[in-house]
């Protein structure tokens, strides 16, 4: 057995010891973290959020509740975790996690027809007319390209009526990137009930990202990739919200109202996997470019992404935060100063003015 002990030279009061023991005992009965929070009536110190999350994560990794102890002796307090040398493999994941992974494994391969169109676009001698003729053979794809050309991210003075015109306005390079999101839409739309709500939110994120990109003068190619990444960044949430609707909705309500933990951390504790990880696994399965897998994996942890992806992840994070603030699910004070500086917002008034105008324009 491996024992990990973290010691602090602070004495716990009898009330604190009693509260901790109550939370440990309660945590053993919860099926997931969302359930724990719905039942938590004591608001002091987050009603033991950190403690419950720790116990749920240990449970997800196959450790029993008895593996975790808090001891107070004299003026010292210790947190002890006992890790057995052998943990049975079948206990390493919750059944919920296994079911989610099975659903990812069961997804079809990325449409070959779309890959063929991307290959055709990459050839220098291909014309818009030739590409349009190939796309027209796929009625669903043609309709989705027209919808995209008329969406907020590509809004024009007049409605785009023809596929040829849509491709011309979008541009071949940008279309090649957007085909990743359109292929994803074809696969997920009919299979997962949460698709439409998340897709609408992702369209709003893409629209905001385009405005942010213009504000900070990103190159045209970068903007094209950014819009596509914004459309794709939450596909993991589509899966989790469809498969674990009650838990995900509870987590969303709790993280917004209690302001004591990120939704991603709560997903990890409750389900054993996060929507960011689910997204990156799908991107890996479909062999997407790194840009898209990074956008899926790091849009909630933008400050730790590699520097080469900052121009994509920072705007996506900020666009997401704008949407959350619009819905009163987050506050301006939560946004890291580094990201505000990158996106050229010097103060809260400037940010809120931009956010309000973006909302009115969407």
In which residue ranges do the predicted regions lie?
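Conserved glycine-/histidine-rich ATP-lid loop and adjacent helix of the Bergerat-fold HATPase_c
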Residues: 46-67, 71
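Glycine-rich nucleotide-binding loop
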Residues: 72-80
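Terminal helices and disordered tails flanking the catalytic cores of nucleotide-processing hydrolases
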Residues: 330-362
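C-terminal beta-strand of the catalytic ATP-binding
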Residues: 8, 81-92
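Post-HEXXH active-site segment of zinc metalloproteases
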Residues: 244-258
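Glycine-rich/acidic phosphate-handling loop/turn and adjacent ATP-lid/helix
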Residues: 1-49
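Charge-biased C-terminal accessory regions appended to nucleic-acid-, cytoskeletal NTPase
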Residues: 251-252, 277-278, 306, 344-345
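Conserved alpha-helical "signature site"
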Residues: 89-234, 238-247, 263-275, 281-293, ...
């Amino acid at each position: 057995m491996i024992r990990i002990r973290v010691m602090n030279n602070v004495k716990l009061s009898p009330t604190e010891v009693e509260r901790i023991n109550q939370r440990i005992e309660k945590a053993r009965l919860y099926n997931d973290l969302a359930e724990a929070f719905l039942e938590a009536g004591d608001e002091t110190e987050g009603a033991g959020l950190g403690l419950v999350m720790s116990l749920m994560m240990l449970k997800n990794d196959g450790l029993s509740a008895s593996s975790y102890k808090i001891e107070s002796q004299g003026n010292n307090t210790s947190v002890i975790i006992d890790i057995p040398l052998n943990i049975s493999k079948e206990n390493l994941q919750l059944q919920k996690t296994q079911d989610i992974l099975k659903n990812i494994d069961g997804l079809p391969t990325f449409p070959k027809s779309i890959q063929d169109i991307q290959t055709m676009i990459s050839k220098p001698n291909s014309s818009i007319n030739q590409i349009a003729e190939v796309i027209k053979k796929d009625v669903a794809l043609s309709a989705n390209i027209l919808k995209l050309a008329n969406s907020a991210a590509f809004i024009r003075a007049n409605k785009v009526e023809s596929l040829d015109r849509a491709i011309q306005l979008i541009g071949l390079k940008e279309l090649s990137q957007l085909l990743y999101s359109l292929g994803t839409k074809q696969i997920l739309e009919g299979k997962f009930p949460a698709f439409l709500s998340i897709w609408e939110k992702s369209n709003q994120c893409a629209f905001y990202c385009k405005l942010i990109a213009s504000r900070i003068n990103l190159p045209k190619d970068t903007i094209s990739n950014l819009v596509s990444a914004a459309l794709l960044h939450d596909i993991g949430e589509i899966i989790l919200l469809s498969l674990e609707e009650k838990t995900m909705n509870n987590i969303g309500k709790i993280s917004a109202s209690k302001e004591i933990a990120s939704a991603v951390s709560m997903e990890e504790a409750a389900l054993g996997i996060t929507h960011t990880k689910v997204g990156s696994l799908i991107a890996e399965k479909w062999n997407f470019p790194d840009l898209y897998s990074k956008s899926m994996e790091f849009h909630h942890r933008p400050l730790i992404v590699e520097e080469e992806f900052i121009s994509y992840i920072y705007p996506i994070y900020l666009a997401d935060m704008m949407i959350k603030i619009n819905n009163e699910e987050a506050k301006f004070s939560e946004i890291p100063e580094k990201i505000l500086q990158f996106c050229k917002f010097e103060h809260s008034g400037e940010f809120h003015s931009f956010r309000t105008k973006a909302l009115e324009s969407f």
